[in-house]
């Protein structure tokens, strides 16, 4: 079996186009356009790239985009004050604080200070809690985007044995909750997990998010499995690769995401969609 590629770029573009249509409809109805504030603290090169893609996506769909590029010396109180200001700004529907933050800043404290109704990253405890209670509000962007990618395959996830490799707060844990909502039977692994190979070989649906190139050998993949590779790793030769051995995995999977061009574009598209949702809810 040779896998079909899940084209994250094409699916993300379709979602962005849909959001753009909604924005144009709001304008024609005399309603305001959504606004997104993006806060970057410090000058981490990877964060600058991610923030740039988010700002570009905002412009493409017609959002108001506010950029706050702060020095790495920014204090916690200064950042909290900016978040408070944006919480009270009616023209801003979404507040995004790019992670990771410098070590002198408490990321949890900052995220909890964002109004949950403007938490378009979906990281606030209130939004994560709603996902746990099967009452999703603003959902974490990467897991939400992955659900859209899975839906694009046309395969009903109900009853599938799903394996999430990696238990981070950003991807792994909320991904498990999303798959439970999709009625999968879910296992989440971490560094203390035993017999990882056996679990991978049994998985109908595999989501890998560990940040280690080629961490999952392709020959472990179950024949016909859906493989979602969240990892994006740059090798010494400059090539970008995922956490799964793509070459071997694509010969066994039924569907697989490429790296790059798979999950990454959907994360940004989901952020844009969340911002529109936040705007629509604030207008009700």
Curated annotation (Swiss-Prot):
Keywords, in A-Z order: Amino-acid biosynthesis, Histidine biosynthesis, Hydrolase, Methionine biosynthesis, Multifunctional enzyme, NADP, One-carbon metabolism, Oxidoreductase, Purine biosynthesis
Gene Ontology terms: biological process: L-histidine biosynthetic process; methionine biosynthetic process; purine nucleotide biosynthetic process; tetrahydrofolate interconversion
Organism: Colwellia psychrerythraea (strain 34H / ATCC BAA-681) (Vibrio psychroerythus)
Subunit structure comment from the entry: Homodimer.
Record flagged with keyword Protein biosynthesis: no
Protein name: Bifunctional protein FolD 2
Function in brief: Catalyzes the oxidation of 5,10-methylenetetrahydrofolate to 5,10-methenyltetrahydrofolate and then the hydrolysis of 5,10-methenyltetrahydrofolate to 10-formyltetrahydrofolate.
Catalyses which reaction(s): (6R)-5,10-methylene-5,6,7,8-tetrahydrofolate + NADP(+) = (6R)-5,10-methenyltetrahydrofolate + NADPH; (6R)-5,10-methenyltetrahydrofolate + H2O = (6R)-10-formyltetrahydrofolate + H(+)
Originating gene: folD2
One cellular-component annotation, GO: cytosol
Database matches in PANTHER family: C-1-TETRAHYDROFOLATE SYNTHASE, CYTOPLASMIC, C-1-TETRAHYDROFOLATE SYNTHASE, CYTOPLASMIC-RELATED
Taxonomic path: Bacteria, Pseudomonadati, Pseudomonadota, Gammaproteobacteria, Alteromonadales
């Amino acid at each position: 079996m040779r896998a079909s590629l899940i084209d994250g770029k094409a699916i993300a573009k379709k979602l962005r186009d849909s959001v753009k249509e909604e924005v144009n409809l709001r304008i024609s109805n005399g309603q305001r356009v959504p606004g997104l504030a993006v806060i970057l603290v410090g000058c981490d090169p990877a964060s600058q790239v991610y923030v740039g893609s988010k700002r570009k996506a905002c412009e493409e769909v017609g959002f108001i985009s506010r950029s706050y590029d702060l020095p790495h010396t920014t204090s916690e109180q200064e950042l909290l004050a900016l978040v408070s200001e944006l919480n009270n700004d009616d023209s801003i529907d979404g507040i995004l604080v790019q992670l990771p933050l410098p070590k002198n800043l408490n990321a949890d404290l900052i995220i909890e200070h964002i109004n949950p109704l403007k938490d378009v990253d979906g990281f606030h405890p209130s939004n994560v809690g709603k996902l746990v209670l099967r009452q999703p509000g603003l959902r974490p962007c990467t897991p939400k985007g992955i659900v859209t990618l899975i839906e694009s395959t046309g395969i009903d996830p109900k009853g599938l044995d799903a394996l999430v490799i990696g238990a981070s707060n950003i991807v792994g844990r909320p991904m498990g909750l999303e798959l439970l909502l999709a009625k999968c039977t879910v296992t989440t692994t971490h560094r203390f997990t035993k017999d990882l190979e056996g679990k991978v070989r049994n998985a109908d649906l595999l989501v890998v998010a560990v940040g280690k190139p080629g961490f999952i050998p392709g020959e472990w993949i179950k024949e016909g499995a859906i493989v979602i590779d969240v990892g994006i790793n740059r090798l010494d030769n400059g090539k970008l690769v995922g956490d799964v051995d793509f070459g071997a995995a694509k010969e066994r999977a039924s569907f697989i995401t490429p790296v790059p061009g798979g999950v990454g574009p959907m994360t940004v598209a989901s952020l844009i969609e969340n911002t529109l949702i936040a705007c629509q809810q604030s207008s009700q």
